[in-house]
């Protein structure tokens, strides 16, 4: 019994000093196999190892080392080394960069050329558009659902690290690497030095360029408001690999064998990692410490690296700094060993093992439970000062549209006797601002206080407390992450990860506009909805419309098919009454408001029998307003609906380049600060309009809709000019009145008597002629029936003489 107790005690002591236990993954090798590798085996071009994780699919990874392996089950099966077909003729099959994109593709740079590999179909393809050597492909993967997030993931760069700027070619892709295009580098013309990298920094809605000159690295930015500033310079003696940490929080890791640097704000400040040693905090100088970093692992909140001197370091990365500690020693390192995070607080040490009898490699895996390892008393770490930090905002992407706001909340329960400080951070303060309040609202069963953190977010412009040059352009959509963390959290809070989510300051896809239809031509009995649904057509007269291509006048009437499914019953409008549509803004199927933004309309069939009630002068324009003629050249090129919020210029602002020269032209913008209306011409019939919101400050969405109206009450257009008709009527009336006076007076005179006698004779002659003509007509009518009867009698006699036999 005593022996058993001693054995248990020894086993407990051994476990206490062991980071992890190695187990070997070996599958599919029961029977002997003659499988041989097809193609050229790939290898990593650098002397270290690295495991690239697919951020959105946790079980899919690529191991880069002297051999390359791709797993879809987290290295839980034996694998063949990855090869590239000989038909691609890649030359030396060395990989300098790898990047996962959406779907089942991973992009590789092999010997200066780009290739894509579909790991489900096992197919390779050379990337299109890259004509010069490149060394790296960079991107920032977004894992939320939706087209907006997919668009972020599809933005990529391909570049040659170490290339001279200006001079080196940079390629970009907006379709997930299917094809690349040569980037216009005019914005980089002021930069000099060598290129350390170019990155999509979605956390700040920026493109960042790492430039190296005189052993100093500096991040430069291409978009306003950071395009005239740069990050703080840092030491850059040897080429650094750049890791973009996931979830668009702005965290980066820059490392090589002799250096490891971090940034929490997309490169604006790059600093050293802080080392914790017996409660003493110092900057980790890798070169001075005489260690060689061999493999680096990171996830959204953690960092670890394995050094060739056989030590493993672990740390957490937050906005307050990156702190690491050397874990208890255990022999782990070999030239093939690499590390990666399998989950929060779970670090995997991976070593491929060759099999002399099979082509497939096995894997030695050693799982490090970081939380358990940090409990070692020798590390002297303080316990976590927070018991709970949770919120419903995680794993959800939110949208803040123009003039909107968002409210979030989080629950915090501190450790008993502790008073931690919550921290709220946004990665893009140029676009997104917030206000936070912390309130105590009760206790747990064991007496701990509960706190609720309320956060209100809206565009930085609308808080009104930032310098104009600090805020991003309000017209341009942006992205920012929001993170809730504990400012004074200890390193032992491994399982208490920060709360983070992504905010899109942009178009709310649940919004739409609808033109109100309270009185329609169907409800008033003018049109029949049943007939409208039966392929109803109507005719537009050639005089009433212009061809869509504006090439001369219409030659024929236009027959239009009415789209009842999209348009419904037309709204009823009286032709002579100025009218404008009432536009409703809907969100998530609910009416939000009656829209008062500026918008424009266009009759989609080319009808021109309507006008506007205001001119540039009566609309109080201070510059020449835009109108549809401004965009006619683009319409001829069959471009989409072109007058929108992106190219609209208000005439109510001074514009030296476009002064008000023609104040009497039509003002063709509806809504906003004017009461402009539509005036329909003297024509009854259906009009089908396309409506587009052009106000750039109403919504980031391109809000548009189509609707129809039926104009009634117009009398037919007269064939004569009204002025000519009135002139003829007045002349005829005056002439008749004059004749009624002049004729009786003239008849009393001798000359009048002679004229009267002459007229009498003419009348008698006419009557005689008419009477004779009448008698002759009557005689013909009487004689004609008699001839017909005589002819019929003759035919009867002939028939009697010659009867049929």
Curated annotation (Swiss-Prot):
- Those parts of the protein on the Cytoplasmic side are 746-805
Primary localization = membrane
Q: Name one GO biological process term.
A: flagellated sperm motility
**Annotated compartments:** Cell projection, Cilium, Flagellum membrane
Annotated membrane-spanning segments are: 724-745
**Where on the tree of life does the source sit, at the highest rank?**
Eukaryota
**Cystine connections:** 20-366, 56-143, 142-149, 384-493, 507-701, 522-569, 621-651
Which Gene Ontology cellular component terms are annotated? CatSper complex; sperm principal piece
What keywords are assigned to this protein? Cell membrane, Cell projection, Cilium, Developmental protein, Differentiation, Disulfide bond, Flagellum, Glycoprotein, Membrane, Signal, Spermatogenesis, Transmembrane, Transmembrane helix
Q: How does it sit in the membrane?
A: Single-pass type I membrane protein
Tissue localization of expression: Testis-specific.
Annotated signal sequence range: 1-16
Q: Which residues lie on this side of the membrane: Extracellular?
A: 17-723
Disruption outcome: Mice are normal but males are sterile. Male sterility is due to defects in sperm cell hyperactivation and decreased stability of Catsper1.
- Kindly list every residue the record annotates as glycosylated: 227, 419, 469, 535, 627
Q: Tell me, in a sentence or two, what this protein's role is.
A: Auxiliary component of the CatSper complex, a complex involved in sperm cell hyperactivation. Sperm cell hyperactivation is needed for sperm motility which is essential late in the preparation of sperm for fertilization. Required for CATSPER1 stability before intraflagellar transport and/or incorporation of the CatSper complex channel into the flagellar membrane.
- Return the similarity comment: Belongs to the CATSPERD family.
Cite the record's note on assembly.
Component of the CatSper complex or CatSpermasome composed of the core pore-forming members CATSPER1, CATSPER2, CATSPER3 and CATSPER4 as well as auxiliary members CATSPERB, CATSPERG2, CATSPERD, CATSPERE, CATSPERZ, C2CD6/CATSPERT, SLCO6C1, TMEM249, TMEM262 and EFCAB9. HSPA1 may be an additional auxiliary complex member. The core complex members CATSPER1, CATSPER2, CATSPER3 and CATSPER4 form a heterotetrameric channel.
Q: Write down what this protein is called.
A: Cation channel sperm-associated auxiliary subunit delta
Which species is this UniProt entry from? Mus musculus (Mouse)
